[in-house]
Amino acid sequence: MTKLIDLSHPLEGGQRVFPEDPPISVEIHHTIDSIGYNLTKVSLSSHQGTHLDAPYHFFDNGETVDQIDLHRFYGPATVVDLAPGGALEARTPLTAQSFEPHADLFQPGARILYRTGWDRMFGRPEFFTDSPTLTLGAARWIADRKIGLLGMDTPTPSEDWLECHHILLRSGTEIVIVEGLTRLEQLPEGFVFIGFPANSVSST
């Protein structure tokens, strides 16, 4: 039987989110006793928990989630473990040199996930404030290699979030960014990544 590994964090009402984002709310809307069936009402932004960034997140003329070819979210992938058997310290800079030993994996169209061990901090304030961070030089190094998808176990690629996202999502590069992954240490060297988003029209 094929082994499946869930790389996503659960979504719960009231859990910590990005400081400027709306809170997650999960409410009982109908019950069996009241109307004959149970129904929950879920309210959240498109960037809660494990999620992806479409180019439209940072560019008004960029593709929205529903416009991205589905093949971008599915296919052979590789994990780059930057902290084998452990976890990186808070705010560890991830430089181009961090990825150079794995340069042969960064081929055009490749799907690359990198592990820092920071998913252990999910649910704490530090998850958002102190995560290991791509340097802009590393972001350019990755963008220059024209990979198709970049995933990570941090909530955002870099503390220089605006410029880093611009480098990775700009026209002509448009790398799908998947943030807030977990359990990357369970992945084999090569695997099939499945990360289809909800078909949400005009979503970021």
Each model region followed by its residue ranges:
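Active-/binding-site microenvironments in catalytic and ligand-binding cores
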Residues: 1-204
